[in-house]
Amino acid sequence: MNDAVLELVDLKRSFRQGDVTIDVLRGVNASLRRGEIVALLGPSGSGKSTMLQAVGLLEGGFGGTIRIDGEDVTRFQQGERTKTRREKIGFVYQFHHLLPDFNAIENVVLPQLIRGAGQAEAEDRAADLLARLGLSERLHHKPSKLSGGEQQRVAVARALANRPLLVLADEPTGNLDEATADRVFDQFVALVRDHGSAALVATHNERLAARMDCVLRLHEGRIEA
């Protein structure tokens, strides 16, 4: 049985800048299994964000193959890509991107409603996730009334609200102090593992990367051996 959630085969991406072609991804090969937390480590400009955009089906124009849950999503039309993104992928960013006029629980309920969950079910799910992240007393606070660490924990709950197979995180603790970052990351890892998801975490932080199951070092568009 193949338990790979994500498989990348010869993933490539180039951009034109005037008369010059810039190769950002140069044949990336990788795979993630259920329950696995993998660091995508590299400096700024190494192609980390471009790779997450490809895997997250946020952009087209990539060469190679991306398989999510065994399906070659590079062959999908836009409607199928959107459906896969909503049903199978969760996103966590460095900056939380919470809706400012919605409180914590509403921010976690909304993606579930978009996917078709009932209101009561979505609220129960959101309250449970936020409680596990230590936010039981902050459910009805808007983002402006939450600390940076609390905001990021709401973002983690939102990413996991629809029980995604794959979580993509782009510098998820990069805007937090070290102690807060460690707490948020520990909670993130625990939830991902409990859900049986896989997570690909882009970071330039060697210390954070060392705490994950595996490290993919991206340098000039290639995974280093």
UniProtKB/Swiss-Prot annotation:
Residues involved in ATP binding: G42, P43, S44, G45, S46, G47, K48, S49
Give the Gene3D superfamilies listed for this entry.
P-loop containing nucleotide triphosphate hydrolases
Q: An example Gene Ontology cellular component term from the record?
A: plasma membrane
Briefly state the protein's biological role: Part of the ABC transporter complex LolCDE involved in the translocation of mature outer membrane-directed lipoproteins, from the inner membrane to the periplasmic chaperone, LolA. Responsible for the formation of the LolA-lipoprotein complex in an ATP-dependent manner.
Residue limits of the ABC transporter domain?
A: 6-225
Its placement in the membrane is given as: Peripheral membrane protein
Record Pfam families = ABC_tran (PF00005)
Q: Which family does it belong to?
A: Belongs to the ABC transporter superfamily. Lipoprotein translocase (TC 3.A.1.125) family.
Q: What is its main location?
A: membrane
State the top-level EC class: translocase
> PROSITE patterns, from UniProt?
ABC_TRANSPORTER_1 (PS00211), ABC_TRANSPORTER_2 (PS50893), LOLD (PS51244)
Q: What is its EC number?
A: 7.6.2.-
Task: Specify the superkingdom.
Answer: Bacteria
Origin organism of this chain? Sphingopyxis alaskensis (strain DSM 13593 / LMG 18877 / RB2256)
* Keywords, sorted A to Z: ATP-binding, Cell inner membrane, Cell membrane, Membrane, Nucleotide-binding, Translocase, Transport
Q: Where in the cell is it found?
A: Cell inner membrane
Q: Does the keyword Cell cycle apply?
A: no
Q: How does it assemble?
A: The complex is composed of two ATP-binding proteins (LolD) and two transmembrane proteins (LolC and LolE).
The organism's lineage is: Bacteria, Pseudomonadati, Pseudomonadota, Alphaproteobacteria, Sphingomonadales
Question: What parts of the sequence cross the membrane?
Answer: none
Q: Does the keyword Lipid metabolism apply?
A: no
For this entry, list what GO says about its biological process.
lipoprotein localization to outer membrane; protein localization to outer membrane
Query: Its Gene Ontology molecular function terms?
Result: ATP binding; ATP hydrolysis activity; transmembrane transporter activity
What protein am I looking at?
A: Lipoprotein-releasing system ATP-binding protein LolD
